Amino acid sequence: MYKGIVTPMITPMGQNGEIDYRATEILIDNLADFGVDGLFPMGSTGLFPMFSTDEKKKFLGFVRDHSKKIEVYAGVGSSSTQESVELSKYTEDIGIKVRVLMPTYYIKPDEDWMYRHFSTVISAASNDLFIYNIPQLSGSWISESLIEKLTREFSNVKGIKDSSGDMRFFSRIIRHKNEKFDIFQGQDDLLFLSLSIGASGGVCGLSNISPYITNLYHEFSAGNLEKARKIQIDEVNPLMYAINEATFPAGYYYAFYKMNGIKGGYRAPMVEPTTDQKKKIDQELTKIPKKQ
C-alpha cells in the first residue's frame, strides 16, 4: 500500500540548461528533511519531454542512488510507447519499485489507442505502475472504465495520480481505492479536501520548496483536522497561487533556486518568471520557516 506525500521533483539545471546534479543532491536533502514519502523524477514538474532518453535514464539512476531510502516513483511517460517501454525496463533493471505513466500526448489517442499504450508499457516490466491522469497537459482523459480495466487485467497497476483538478471525477474514482490500489491527489490546493474523502496522499509540487505539504499531511493523519485545514488555506494555497502566476513550471524552479541560493537555469523554451512574478513569489517565500 502506498501513501503519504510524493514530490514531483523539479529537474535542477545550470545556467547552460544542463542538469545540475549537485543542486539535485541539495533538493533530495531538503526533501528528506521535509519528510516526504516518495520522489517522482521525470514527471511534468520535472519537464520530462525536454530531455533525451539517455538524460532521463541518467537522472533516474542518480535519484535512485541518492534517494536516502525514500521510495522512487520513476516517470516513464512519453509520446512514444517504445521509449516508455525502454524506460520501464531500465527502472526495473536498476531496482526502482514504481513507475508512473501518463497517456501519449500531442496526437490525441482514443480509448483503444490509450489501452494499447498502457497495456504494452505495463507488461514491459514487473515493477509496480501508477496511472497518471493530467488531461490539461496530455490532452486526454483517462476514463474510469479504463482505470477499472487496467487494474482488473494487471496486478502491478497499484494506483493513480489524478492531476485533473476535477473533484467530481476524483470523488468517483476514490471508490476504487482498496488495499491494492491507491489514489493520490495531484493538485496541491485540493489536498485537504481529497484526504477528507479518503485519498491515499498527494503528489504535490510545493513539497519541492517548503514543508507546508508534509506538515498538512502529518496533521491530518494525526487527526488534527483544523490545523491541517489552516495549513491548506493560510500556507499552501497562497504559495501555490503566487508560484502559478508564472508559466508552469517555471515558478517552482525559481522558488527552489531562490530558497537555496542557487544560480540555476531554465532549459529553452522555458523562461524564468517576470520581475513582477518573482516579487509575488518572494513575498510568500519569506513566510517559510528557515531550516534550523
From Swiss-Prot:
One of its GO terms (cellular component) is cytoplasm. Keywords: Cytoplasm, Lyase, Schiff base. The keyword Kinase does not apply. GO terms for biological process: small molecule metabolic process. PROSITE patterns: DHDPS_2. The keyword Cytoplasm applies. It is an enzyme of class 4 (lyase). Pfam families: DHDPS. The active site is at S44 (charge relay system), Y106 (charge relay system), Y132 (proton donor), K161 (schiff-base intermediate with substrate). Its EC number is 4.-.-.-. GO terms for molecular function: 2-dehydro-3-deoxy-phosphogluconate aldolase activity; 4-hydroxy-tetrahydrodipicolinate synthase activity. It is found in: Cytoplasm. Its main location: cytoplasm. It comes from the Archaea. Transmembrane segments: none annotated. PANTHER family: 4-HYDROXY-2-OXOGLUTARATE ALDOLASE, MITOCHONDRIAL, DIHYDRODIPICOLINATE SYNTHASE. Belongs to the DapA family. This is Uncharacterized DapA-like lyase Ta1157. The lineage of its organism: Archaea, Methanobacteriati, Thermoplasmatota, Thermoplasmata, Thermoplasmatales. The gene is dapAL.
